[in-house]
Amino acid sequence: MIWHIQNENFILDSTRIFMKAFHLLLFDGSFIFPECILIFGLILLLMIDSTSDQKDIPWLYFISSTSLVMSITALLFRWREEPMISFSGNFQTNNFNEIFQFLILLCSTLCIPLSVEYIECTEMAITEFLLFVLTATLGGMFLCGANDLITIFVAPECFSLCSYLLSGYTKKDVRSNEATTKYLLMGGASSSILVHGFSWLYGSSGGEIELQEIVNGLINTQMYNSPGISIALIFITVGIGFKLSPAPSHQWTPDVYEGSPTPVVAFLSVTSKVAASASATRIFDIPFYFSSNEWHLLLEILAILSMILGNLIAITQTSMKRMLAYSSIGQIGYVIIGIIVGDSNGGYASMITYMLFYISMNLGTFACIVSFGLRTGTDNIRDYAGLYTKDPFLALSLALCLLSLGGLPPLAGFFGKLHLFWCGWQAGLYFLVSIGLLTSVVSIYYYLKIIKLLMTGRNQEITPHVRNYIRSPLRSNNSIELSMIVCVIASTIPGISMNPIIAIAQDTLF
């Protein structure tokens, strides 16, 4: 009898939960329409893979790319709409969140054509790769719009789980297995640290989980200046730091970059930073509103360590991917300057603008590395010597992307850094901006060192890898070079295009 009553209660509770979920999806589904497009694309991929043969492989790429482009289109049509909070306060839709979602979708859209030839040559499983990329993109998009602690924890876990699987996709590669193990262990540790920080916020605010309600709860409980908030700030900064990979939370980055498949590294190097930056701005700016001095100091320390260590250690690297790993650590230091400045002096606008340029510069560089690696099988910087004599197009493309990463005028990276540093200078971050300028000069040194190798024509310096280099005969049909051309053009945009980009970015306020 008791079992029967308990069974009936379980059925009633399950029905209520299902009806509530259906009600939320029915009335709030329009607020996540771009995400729904990706979910539909995921389902379609699974259906086609389970019912088709190898001849339908082009359809898998087409569906993935189309769903991403349609999701971007849906975001653009929703631009400038009034900010809305949906799903019982769990998700927020506004211009600020949507521009970060756009950046993530743009990264994924460029990464798929970059991966096609690599997947074919290495005989990787295609469907699973595309599923993981789309699911990680979905997790990143939900993280950008997350408005409560639970969603902020679950969304990056969705992204991280796919990242672990992608980094270990080449199971027979010992370096890939080692990288995945380190990535998984450190990712699990950082997630536990992050949720511990959330628990301090939850308790201090009187049991609130929504970001704005946490602020109100801290005021009501008079806990906004308590030691518990400082503890929460430290734990949350460490947890988010793993996603952003600033120093000293960067230990996993070089190994994962070196051991993972190159298209996976290209995808992770930008999407993880974009999603984590969007989440960091909201977490630091809203729940820690009363602790702005403390988190400014913490981020300044992280930025200084990242810019100095990242760029100095990059000089000593012999692997191209490890060099870019340490370079990315330095780049995130520049991005943190924009987070510290905030809205007051256009910090968020400068950060968004620089991240847009960083996407094109970084993906363009990785497209060149993928193309060179498939034809030579090497990743050593010395093996790039004399590439200009065999493939001038690839050498010039790589040189332009590296120069843009270094911030040389008149390339896009120069104007992105200039605007970012100027906003920091106006906000009074003189020491931080000075460190940024000095480390940018250091980065130009090791980028120019690689470019000098590319352009050398002396036979004694040209390695056998370049002597035996086979140039691609059909450029128009090469998807890697399609991504490369798009990224190189975007990386060399002159300063005349800065004003409209900054104007759009300045509209992305909370």
From Swiss-Prot:
Keywords: Chloroplast, Membrane, NAD, NADP, Plastid, Plastoquinone, Quinone, Thylakoid, Translocase, Transmembrane, Transmembrane helix, Transport. GO terms for molecular function: NADH dehydrogenase (ubiquinone) activity; quinone binding. Its EC number is 7.1.1.-. It catalyses: a plastoquinone + NADH + (n+1) H(+)(in) = a plastoquinol + NAD(+) + n H(+)(out); a plastoquinone + NADPH + (n+1) H(+)(in) = a plastoquinol + NADP(+) + n H(+)(out). GO terms for cellular component: chloroplast thylakoid membrane. The keyword ATP-binding does not apply. It is found in: Plastid, Chloroplast thylakoid membrane. InterPro entries: NADH-Q_OxRdtase_suN/2, ND/Mrp_TM, Ndh2_N. NCBIfam families: NDH_I_N (TIGR01770), PRK02504.1 (NF002701). PANTHER family: NADH DEHYDROGENASE (PTHR22773). This is NAD(P)H-quinone oxidoreductase subunit 2 A, chloroplastic.
